[in-house]
Amino acid sequence: MGKVAVIYWSGTGNTEAMANAVAEGAKAAGAEVDLLTCADVKGVDGYDAVALGCPAMGSEELEDGEFQPMLETIEPALPGKKVALFGSYDWGTGEWLESWEARCAEKGIALAADSVKANNAPDDAALAACKALGAKIS
């Protein structure tokens, strides 16, 4: 098993709950896990896998004050790693996640697991999907 970084930004606690479930799934699969807010990230070079969590903000966009600048810093190091995405949204269909997946593809970042999204607070099914995501990238 490898070393996994679960990196997230959460405004209301919904994406944080998802991040905790991803970390729990990765640990249960035997991985060494660091659970980090985007403000704590110093790079991803020491990790085999990276799970990134961010809620939809504004008009279906990534949070641009802390998360997006951090993402732009680590993106060059993500190709070749196991990468997965997750997050929550309040309205619409979760289009921000589809845009984020397309952004990854444009930058040569292959996703190792299906992305997980939750409408507002994650329900039991979303939390189970987050645990499975964590296990899959471990």
Question: Where does each model-flagged region fall?
Answer:
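Aromatic-flanked redox-active Cys/Sec active sites in thiol-based oxidoreductases
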Residues: 8-12
